[in-house]
Amino acid sequence: MNFETIIGLEVHVELNTNSKIFSPSSAHFGEDPNASTNVIDWSFPGVLPVMNKGVIDAGIKAALALNMSIHQHMHFDRKNYFYPDNPKAYQISQFDEPIGYNGWIDITLEDGSTKKIRIERAHLEEDAGKNTHGTDGYSYVDLNRQGVPLIEIVSEADMRSPEEAYAYLTALKEIIQYTGISDVKMEEGSMRVDANISLRPYGQEAFGTKTELKNLNSFSNVRKGLEFEVERQAKILRSGGVIRQETRRYDEASKGTILMRVKEGAADYRYFPEPDLPLFEIDDAWIEDMRAELPRFPAERRVSYIKDLGLSAYDAGQLTATKALSDFFEQAVALGGDAKQVSNWLQGEVAQFLNAEGKTIDQLALTPDSLVEMIAIIADGTISSKIAKKVFVHLAKHGGSARAYVEKAGLVQISDPAVLIPIIHQVFADNEAAVADFKSGKRNADKAFTGFLMKATKGQANPQIAQQLLAQELQKLLD
């Protein structure tokens, strides 16, 4: 029997506000334990939450970016549960009226086809703290993360393969990153994924019993965990077994999933409206103000790069991987840079430099105008492509004008025959053995002279002109 895979994803995204959702404590990552806390985070008696407007701004932007409807009469709810990292014994979240609902995004699969994935809801909530279990037998609670603003984005169960889940996460991360509301760094916990997966026989309408997957710390692990679950559940069903409703975690060492707990039924969190926060009215003007702050999103940019600039789909995809890279590219083209040449540099030397330095493009001293200027002085013969790589490294580290640096550093390409011919004659004089080989008929010996000349000019000889002049002067040796 063959089975259809049913996947839905829940994605928690930390919003990059300066302060927490209901307290003035810093929301920044990496502080010493409990350094970013105050009486609200510790839930001292009598303290009250104060709404951070920037969180609602971010929620509106996310909802618009994900093609969602917005609840304009929005409230918060209490989600009741006890855990040491939750000192109030409840979490302030949203239940029946999330800020966004009924959305969708398009995903692109590996074969180039596209699919629309529906999004059920996006709701705002506060994050919990973090428990650490020490080797000394004690458990420690760090409340720095308590109250950090989150938006949870819940998809419909529209994905039918691990590949589609991977594509959905890739597209979702791109969109959220473009809005500027989060850096979506999984390694820092600002994007966290839970997956729900079930199988059903083809043709059956009802969903099968789902398994929830946790500990998915990369998109690759999401895909691997789901692939393992497809095989595990199919094997059980084909042998006549029954799938239990479980929570499992992905284990990188075994490349499989491990049981965490069996779910007997749905958790009863006893939601009720948060009495310490008012109803929030989100009027049309507020929504339009947030819409005006949104950029062009990657899908629209890719279409433009292909249609208007003549780039390949691959190049367009690479250039829109991050908003910073895409903005840099567009600024360079607007300054007169050739789209294909700018693209080649960004995907070649620039990408290699960023990877080696562990930086992003907005951390470089290189500016779009200096890159365009460098491309121009390659085209007009001022420098060679080889010298340009050296120039680029300087600009990436120190910035400034490409032409000014080339002139100051003495890197201008030598193209004048009146300068090159005497150097060629000196090369002949310094390499008599090679000249003798050439004269004796060893025609391949002429290739050595190119290297000798480039060494003598420190790589500054114009390659095309140098080759022409070498051929001319070598011929004279035979005449």
Curated annotation (Swiss-Prot):
Keyword ATP-binding: yes
InterPro entries cross-referenced by the UniProt entry: Asn/Gln-tRNA_amidoTrfase_suB/E, Asn/Gln-tRNA_Trfase_suB/E_cat, Asn/Gln_amidotransferase, Asn/Gln_tRNA_amidoTrase-B-like, GatB, GatB_C_1, GatB_Yqey_C_2, Gln-tRNA_amidoTrfase_suB_CS
Entries under SMART domains matching the protein: GatB_Yqey
Keyword terms, alphabetized: ATP-binding, Ligase, Nucleotide-binding, Protein biosynthesis
Catalysed conversion reaction: L-glutamyl-tRNA(Gln) + L-glutamine + ATP + H2O = L-glutaminyl-tRNA(Gln) + L-glutamate + ADP + phosphate + H(+); L-aspartyl-tRNA(Asn) + L-glutamine + ATP + H2O = L-asparaginyl-tRNA(Asn) + L-glutamate + ADP + phosphate + 2 H(+)
Disulphides: none
A single MF term (Gene Ontology): ATP binding
Subunit (UniProt): Heterotrimer of A, B and C subunits.
NCBIfam families, alphabetized: gatB, PRK05477.1-1, PRK05477.1-2, PRK05477.1-4
Similarity annotation: Belongs to the GatB/GatE family. GatB subfamily.
Protein purpose: Allows the formation of correctly charged Asn-tRNA(Asn) or Gln-tRNA(Gln) through the transamidation of misacylated Asp-tRNA(Asn) or Glu-tRNA(Gln) in organisms which lack either or both of asparaginyl-tRNA or glutaminyl-tRNA synthetases. The reaction takes place in the presence of glutamine and ATP through an activated phospho-Asp-tRNA(Asn) or phospho-Glu-tRNA(Gln).
Protein name per UniProt: Aspartyl/glutamyl-tRNA(Asn/Gln) amidotransferase subunit B
Organism the protein comes from: Streptococcus equi subsp. zooepidemicus (strain MGCS10565)
